[in-house]
Amino acid sequence: MADINLGQLAATTLQKYQPKLVDNIYKKHVILNHLKANGGTVMYNGGRQLVVPLMYGTNSTVQTFDGTDTLDTTYQEGIDVATYDWKFYNVAVAFTMVDKIKNKGKEQVLSLLKAKIKQAELALSEKINTDLISGSDAKGLVGLLTMSDATSTVGGISGTTYSWWRGNIDSKAVTVSFSDMRAVKNSCMNGNGGSKVSLIVTSQAIYQKLFALLTATYQFNPTQAATKEGKRLAEASFEMLEFEGIPVVYDEAMAADDMFFINKDNYKLGILEDANFAVIDKSQPSDQHVSIQHIVFGGAAYTDRRASLGQMTEKKSA
């Protein structure tokens, strides 16, 4: 039997699997899934930073007039930009000569390759998802915990300094309630430039508490969603409730007492075209019998309106 070129087989296998890998990542994690299905993932071909225009003021020159009335042409402030740095993630898929020796035959080697690729896929997707929720590493994505608060600097703009650049927060240490959820939800939808909250994400503990508060009829058929997005998420196998027309889901990466309110129109994931879970050609160290493939992701989580985002923290589920 001809000798198996492990590096070549690994490269070919990973390249063929890459589209499925991307699909799996978006299927597994509900925030990514929601953004992907609703125009919340935006492709970029590069640039030093991701620059996002903001509108934080109103135009005061709006007026009624008649005939030869003088029109107000006062120059308007209120336009700014937020800048987000690109963040990069890498996972290595390594195969050694010993792997090949211990797994004789192409089928056995291929089985090992697929297992290692799946392992890399899961590790990379978990890391990106966790950072998307609560990331605080300067090299990683800005997490929702930071992006939806009221004081952090996001996109180069301080929430402490500018009141219009703040999320809506409820940090009272009380048992979660629909009335408190309603207050945060409504605050996220107030003002110009925003739109309806499109997804509420919480922990399993809080989700189960909300489920217990619902009627027995709804508990009997919890996937009987009223909204299009609710039905889509249920059909995608996500556990889902609806609160005033908004899907409520849970994610394992959420802190036990947290809840986030997301608006797909104002919260996005920018992705670099050349680093969209790209497979990088193999490298072989000169001092080791190792063949290495890399899977690379580059992007930035961003918002153009923090006031459209909300968070509840310190909520009790019992």
Positions of the model-derived regions?
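Flexible, glycine/threonine- and acidic-rich loop/arm segments that mediate assembly and lattice contacts
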Residues: 1-318
